């Protein structure tokens, strides 16, 4: 066996299929030899052991001293205690029942009206997961209409309020924050809450929190008597929260089967517990990533789902893969700068965009094609020109064109897209990420870079208030004047703060030239 990307024997030897899941995985167009894959197979003895310990409740997130329990969510019986098992089962049943009550009209607003919409407020995995759920699975005119605030962009918040202006009284406001202290959802929540109160609209009786017990958000929702509080466990990270209440509540509110979603994820987990390397799809997938990137992430991952409903999947994988694997240090404390960059959109659109570079430009990537075999049961398509067949042809053609230039790829094929298969697909990548992290000996479950960014942002927000207070006192100030009062190392941030404050704001008089920061003098003229 050699690294030939077009070997039929290699294709047959490394094609994985499961007839319970109806999912295929083909890694044959990754360049590797039998010796390389055999050597890697030996490493998986320790990988499988580590994942088994994780699932049994070991403190796998050493840096944060936490268990990692998202795999328990789809099979509560494997959780390390009966208390956790009972809690998970109760949460799932509570969400399912709540969804039915909302959709049936058993739970209505203060005016005895059925709810029509959901405004979902969440950042990172608390936004991306639900967006993936609704984009992939929601059928037209089924369930509640979903809108999202997954950023503190003032235009986004304003647009959402305008879009829902006539329906705010029948809108559920879902706020997701594990700790309750994340600034973005808190700021958006306060703006929406204030808008409702200023317009004599209900907030408390329409509001739902998804958070940890006894968090700041939990206490707020409890004291204000919000409509509902759903549990988000301490041992569930944001990027792996889609099989928790974060993903299950959207499923319930669009009238999809949350139990099928969980079952799909659970069956994929089960398939990836086998220690038979060549029959373990997550082992094969993570091995392909490892081999194509020489174990140090040399190649970017380009995700190309050939179905519009999975367009968000590449964004979802960006967080799952990059936040999990993008680490400066390994578990020994050695600098390794690990990571795999992820981007993508959808096929066949991308064939008319950057696939040109993928085939003929710099060879620094591998593709993951995602194929669906199903088609709508409709008579509107001409049998001679069925778009499904064209789409399949475009995928195979692109795959072939890339391999003809020795450009590497992986293909994942699903029989159909539904709750079950989406749950399985997500679980496959979650497991592959866990396996890859074990291969390269990094902690996949912390995010020190994200925390550093949060701290830096908090410092800037503190300076914003200091600058505002200083200008409120009166007088003219240059950037040097301001930095000399605070910290001479923050001249650039002070410039950005002043620019953001002054443009489009008549309360400030600016003298000087914005292209020459040292010439600027700012004074507040209106209160």
Swiss-Prot record:
InterPro entries: G6P_Isomerase (IPR001672), Phosphoglucose_isomerase_CS (IPR018189), SIS_dom_sf (IPR046348), SIS_PGI_1 (IPR035476), SIS_PGI_2 (IPR035482). It catalyses: alpha-D-glucose 6-phosphate = beta-D-fructose 6-phosphate. Its EC number is 5.3.1.9. The active site is at residues 323, 352, 454. It is found in: Cytoplasm. Pathway: Carbohydrate biosynthesis; gluconeogenesis; Carbohydrate degradation; glycolysis; D-glyceraldehyde 3-phosphate and glycerone phosphate from D-glucose: step 2/4. Keywords: Cytoplasm, Gluconeogenesis, Glycolysis, Isomerase. NCBIfam families: PRK14096.1. Catalyzes the reversible isomerization of glucose-6-phosphate to fructose-6-phosphate. This is Glucose-6-phosphate isomerase.
């Amino acid at each position: 066996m050699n690294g030939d990307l077009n070997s039929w024997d290699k294709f047959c030897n490394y094609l994985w299929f499961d007839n319970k899941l109806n999912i295929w995985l083909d890694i044959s167009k990754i360049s590797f030899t039998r010796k390389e894959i055999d050597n890697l197979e030996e490493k998986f003895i320790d990988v499988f052991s580590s994942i088994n310990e994780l699932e049994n409740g070991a403190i796998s997130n050493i840096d944060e001293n936490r268990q990692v329990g998202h795999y328990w969510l789809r099979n509560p019986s494997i959780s390390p205690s009966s208390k956790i098992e009972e809690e998970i089962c109760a949460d799932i049943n509570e969400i399912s029942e709540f969804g039915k009550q909302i959709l049936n009209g058993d739970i209505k607003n203060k005016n005895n009206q059925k709810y029509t919409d959901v405004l979902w407020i969440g950042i990172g995995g608390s936004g991306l997961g639900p967006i993936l759920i609704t984009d992939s699975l929601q059928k037209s005119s089924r369930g509640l209409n979903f809108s999202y605030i997954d950023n503190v962009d003032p235009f986004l918040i304003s647009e959402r309020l305008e879009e829902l202006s006539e329906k705010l009284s029948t809108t559920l406001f879902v706020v997701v924050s594990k700790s309750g202290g994340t600034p973005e959802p808190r700021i958006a929540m306060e703006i929406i809450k204030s808008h409702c109160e200023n317009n004599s609209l209900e907030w408390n009786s329409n509001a739902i929190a998804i958070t940890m017990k006894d968090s700041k958000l939990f206490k707020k929702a409890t004291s204000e008597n919000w409509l509902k509080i759903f549990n988000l466990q301490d041992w569930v990270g944001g990027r792996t929260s889609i099989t928790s209440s974060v993903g299950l509540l959207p499923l319930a509110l669009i009238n999809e089967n949350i139990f099928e979603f969980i079952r799909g994820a659970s069956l994929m987990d089960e398939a990836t517990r086998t220690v038979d390397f060549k029959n373990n799809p997550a082992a094969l997938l993570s091995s392909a990533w490892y081999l194509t990137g020489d174990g140090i992430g040399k190649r970017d991952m380009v995700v190309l789902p050939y179905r519009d409903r999975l367009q968000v999947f590449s964004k979802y994988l960006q967080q799952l893969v990059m936040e999990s694997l993008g680490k400066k240090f390994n578990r020994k404390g050695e600098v390794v700068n690990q990571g795999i960059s992820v981007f993508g959109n959808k096929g066949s659109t991308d064939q008319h965009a950057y696939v040109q570079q993928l085939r003929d430009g710099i060879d620094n990537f591998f593709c993951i094609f995602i194929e669906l075999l199903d088609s709508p049961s409709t008579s509107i398509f001409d049998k001679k020109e069925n778009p499904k067949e064209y789409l399949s042809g475009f995928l195979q053609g692109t795959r072939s064109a890339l391999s003809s230039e020795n450009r590497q790829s992986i293909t994942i094929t699903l029989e159909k897209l539904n709750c079950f298969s989406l749950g399985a697909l997500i679980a496959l990548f979650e497991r592959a990420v866990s396996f890859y992290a074990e291969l390269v000996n990094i902690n996949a479950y912390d995010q020190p870079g994200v925390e550093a960014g949060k701290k830096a942002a908090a410092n800037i927000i503190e300076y914003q208030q200091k600058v505002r207070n200083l200008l409120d006192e009166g007088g003219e100030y240059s950037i040097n004047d301001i930095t000399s009062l605070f910290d001479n190392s923050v001249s650039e941030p002070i410039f950005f703060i002043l620019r953001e404050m002054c443009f489009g704001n008549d309360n400030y008089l600016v003298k000087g030239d914005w292209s020459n920061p040292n010439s600027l003098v700012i004074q507040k003229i209106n209160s």
